[in-house]
């Protein structure tokens, strides 16, 4: 019997703030490729997950879920603060990102465990911005439905980002724009 595929009891999972000792496991979770609009994307945080997050966050909160039986880091997310302009003033707003669940642990209510942690640690401002790929149905179901115990989700609209994959000729690029 494969222990990874059996239901997990809450008491085998620890949700805690990530430490430098978790750096390699965090980079492995983040690097798993995902597909959106037919393009495979892989996020890299080399050589250090924590150093790379300096670009996104001024104040960091990186969280891992560890399976105490296997001592494996099975999920993670970040919910730190970053500066944003609001009504012509710079204010710190929370930005939630890097939500990842190890493929072999999906469907084991890990997002519910994370939801409890988010609610417990969400301080002023008690909301977070986040970006979810439109076709990332697993993340959308986990975050948007309320079934997982995550805080209420409010859709602020669709962000469309264009990507230039080849410089081509100037005429083609100008025509595209």
Residue ranges of predicted features:
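A short helix-loop-beta-strand connector motif used in the catalytic cores of GNAT acetyltransferases and
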Residues: 49-64, 126, 153
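Conserved beta-strand-loop-alpha-helix junction that forms the acyl-donor binding cleft
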Residues: 118, 128-144
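Conserved acetyl-CoA-binding loop-helix of GNAT-fold acetyltransferases
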Residues: 101, 106-121
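Catalytic micro-motifs at enzyme active sites that drive phosphoryl/nucleotidyl and oxygen chemistry
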Residues: 19, 50-52, 81-87, 117
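Acetyl-CoA-dependent GNAT
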Residues: 56-60, 67-88, 97
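Conserved catalytic-core motifs of GNAT/GCN5-like acyltransferases
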Residues: 84, 131, 148-170
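Short amphipathic alpha-helix that is part of the acyltransferase structural core
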Residues: 2-50, 62-66, 73, 95, ...
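Conserved acetyl-CoA binding element of GNAT-fold acetyltransferases
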Residues: 91-103
């Amino acid at each position: 019997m494969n222990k990874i595929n059996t239901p997990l009891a809450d008491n085998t999972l620890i949700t805690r703030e990530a430490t430098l000792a978790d750096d390699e496991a965090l980079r492995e979770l983040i690097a798993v490729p995902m597909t959106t609009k037919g393009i495979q994307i892989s996020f890299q945080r080399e050589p250090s997950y924590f150093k790379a997050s300096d670009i996104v966050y001024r104040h960091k909160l990186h969280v891992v879920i560890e399976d105490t039986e296997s001592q494996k880091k099975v999920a993670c997310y970040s919910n730190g603060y970053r500066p944003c302009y609001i009504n012509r003033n710079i204010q710190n707003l929370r930005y939630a990102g890097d939500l990842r669940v190890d493929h072999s642990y999906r469907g084991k209510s890990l997002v519910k465990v994370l939801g409890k942690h988010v609610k417990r640690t969400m301080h002023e401002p008690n909301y977070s911005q986040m970006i979810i790929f439109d076709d990332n149905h697993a993340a959308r179901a986990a975050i948007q439905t309320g079934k997982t115990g995550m805080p209420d989700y409010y859709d602020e609209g669709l962000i469309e980002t264009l990507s230039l994959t080849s410089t081509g000729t100037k005429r083609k690029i100008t025509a595209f724009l």
